[in-house]
Regions:
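Catalytic binding pocket for nucleotide-activated donors in carbohydrate/polymer assembly enzymes
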Residues: 65, 70-157, 161-162
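Short, small-residue-biased leader/transition segments that mark boundaries at the very start
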Residues: 1-6
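Short donor-sugar binding/catalytic loops of nucleotide-sugar-dependent glycosyltransferases
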Residues: 8-10, 38
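A conserved mid-protein helix/loop that constitutes part of the nucleotide-sugar donor-binding site
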Residues: 10-23
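Residue-level signal for the nucleotide or nucleotide-sugar donor/cofactor binding architecture
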Residues: 13, 131, 165
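C-terminal alpha-helical cap of glycosyltransferases
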Residues: 167-182
Length: 182
């Protein structure tokens, strides 16, 4: 499974969690694509790991919207371990492409990416609650294991691609609440 991290490379995006388990991530059967700019220590870390593991990781320390969309289109997973995320667009864009989110349950990420229940196929991605590197690593491992079941993986991708995050759905929900109050 390929996972990508596309965001501003700053600590509140959870990159300290990624940093804490980078050696473990490099041992998993995944490839990482990093796109974005930010704090120098994270940029340097990603470059260093990309140099050490060129077959496992690509560090693109640039802001390149076209490359980001190409990565969403070609990726399998997007990792968003944010400490806080009031809204979040990355997961919505990723799902539109069929790229499954791995998120920490916070803010807008929690609102838009309910945890997948593999038995019922309800949910839209893989989640972890605690702001903890090993919980994040566990979510990555669960996602990579689920990826091996191609039939269910494709179903999850299709469900994510159909998710309606437009205002149409919100307007309907507000309208129902308004009508119930009359």
């Amino acid at each position: 499974a390929a996972s990508d991290v596309y965001k501003r490379q700053v600590s509140h995006k959870g990159l300290d969690l990624v940093q804490a388990v980078m050696d473990d991530l490099m041992q998993e059967d995944i490839q990482l694509v990093i796109i974005g700019t930010g704090e120098q220590n994270y940029e340097n870390m990603f470059r260093s790991y990309a140099d050490q593991y060129p077959e496992k990781m690509s560090a693109n320390i640039v802001f390149d919207n076209k490359l980001a969309h190409e990565t969403y289109a070609g990726g399998d997973l997007v990792l968003m371990p944010s400490k806080m995320e009031p809204c979040g667009l990355t997961q919505l864009i990723a799902m539109r492409y069929g790229t499954v989110p791995i998120i920490r349950e916070t803010g807008g990420l929690y609102d838009t990416v309910p945890a997948l229940n593999p038995e019922t196929m309800e949910g839209r991605g893989f989640t972890f609650k605690s702001y903890n590197a090993h919980d994040m690593l566990d979510a990555v491992r669960r996602a990579a294991a689920f990826y091996q079941d191609s039939k269910h993986w494709k179903l999850l991708q299709k469900n994510d691609m159909k998710f309606d995050s437009s205002w149409n759905q919100s307007v309907q929900e507000y309208w129902q609440i308004y009508r119930s109050m009359l």
